[in-house]
Structure formats: structure tokens, C-alpha cells
């Protein structure tokens, strides 16, 4: 009988009701994501209609997009002022593990993700890992952060053994647990 059931849209299904989006590029005009405030507000409006309750805005920070925490915070304040909805907005960043990240880590100039401020959303090149990946991850941990690897499915060069040296220091892969 299942082929004859009434089809539902995602909105009708309630699938996203109470949902938290932990990684998006909705903060306007800061990276390769949303470019205008109107577009950001339109997306947030659609999120509201779907029942999303919380969004973590995670713009890129990398040598090719050297956003500063001050600039991102200023853009975030602008979005908060323009957005009149009920979704809780939070600011973090998606950090490329490059030389700029190393500088920012040394200065503690970071935008962590999660209410406790102890997790860093990180990424690497899709083609090659950083030459010192294991030590970079260990330095992140030594600074009191837990790395969350964005897009692990894209790193075809990685396998389970690449995660072994830091697996006991809470390298976080996709999970349904709360951050």
C-alpha cells in the first residue's frame, strides 16, 4: 500500500521542526555563500516555515577568504538587526587548516561553535591534507578546543588510520549528539 500514500513536502512532514543547522553560509557577503541581506532573510524565512529553531552561521576563514573575527561579528550584528524572526542565530566559523589558521590559533582569535565555545569547525583541502595535519589537530586540542571536521566525506585521501592519533582526543566526526 505504500505507493498509494499521500506524498508530503518536507514542510508538511515536520522533519525540520526543532532542528538546529550547525553549518551554513547564510551570513551575507563574507564568503562563497549568501551574497545579499535580502537573500539571507529569505532563507531564514524559509527555515522558519520549516520549523528550524536555531542556526549556526559558519562563514569560511582561510587564506583565500581572510575574514577577521571583527568583520564577521559586525556582519552578524547587521543580520541580527535586520532579522525579525524567532530563530536563534549564532556565529562561529569554518576554519581552513592553513597558515592563517595557525596564526589565529596562536592568538586565540577564533569563533568556536557550540554553546560552551569549546569546538572548532575545521576543514582541509579536498585534494591533500596539510603537511602537519596530526600535529595541527593536537595543537587545537592543547588550546582547549575539540576539532569538528567539516565535510569528512570529501576527503578521499583520508582513511581511519589518519584519525587514530587524535581519536582519543575527541576528533569529532558527524554525529547526532549535541555540541
Where are these regions (language model features)?
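Short beta-strands and strand-loop turn motifs
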Residues: 24-28, 55-60, 121-123, 147-152, ...
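An N-terminally biased module of ancient metal coordination in phosphate/nucleic-acid-related enzymes
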Residues: 1-86
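Conserved small/polar residues in nucleotide/adenosyl-binding loops
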Residues: 169-175
Amino acid at each position: 500500500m505504500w505507493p498509494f500514500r499521500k506524498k508530503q513536502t518536507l514542510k508538511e512532514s515536520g522533519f525540520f521542526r526543532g532542528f538546529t543547522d550547525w553549518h551554513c553560509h547564510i551570513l551575507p557577503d563574507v564568503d562563497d555563500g549568501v551574497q545579499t541581506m535580502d537573500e539571507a532573510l529569505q532563507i531564514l524565512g524559509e527555515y522558519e516555515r520549516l520549523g528550524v529553531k536555531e542556526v549556526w552561521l559558519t562563514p569560511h576563514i582561510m587564506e583565500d577568504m581572510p575574514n577577521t573575527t571583527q568583520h564577521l561579528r559586525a556582519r552578524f550584528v547587521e543580520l541580527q538587526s535586520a532579522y525579525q524572526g524567532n530563530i536563534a542565530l549564532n556565529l562561529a566559523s569554518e576554519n581552513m587548516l592553513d597558515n592563517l589558521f595557525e596564526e589565529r590559533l596562536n592568538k586565540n582569535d577564533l569563533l568556536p561553535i557550540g554553546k560552551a565555545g569549546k569546538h572548532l569547525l575545521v576543514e582541509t583541502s579536498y585534494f591533500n591534507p596539510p603537511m602537519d595535519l596530526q600535529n595541527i589537530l593536537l595543537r587545537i586540542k592543547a588550546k582547549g578546543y575539540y576539532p569538528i571536521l567539516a565535510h569528512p566525506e570529501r576527503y578521499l585521501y583520508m582513511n581511519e588510520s589518519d584519525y587514530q592519533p587524535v581519536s582519543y582526543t575527541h576528533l569529532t566526526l558527524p554525529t547526532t549528539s549535541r555540541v
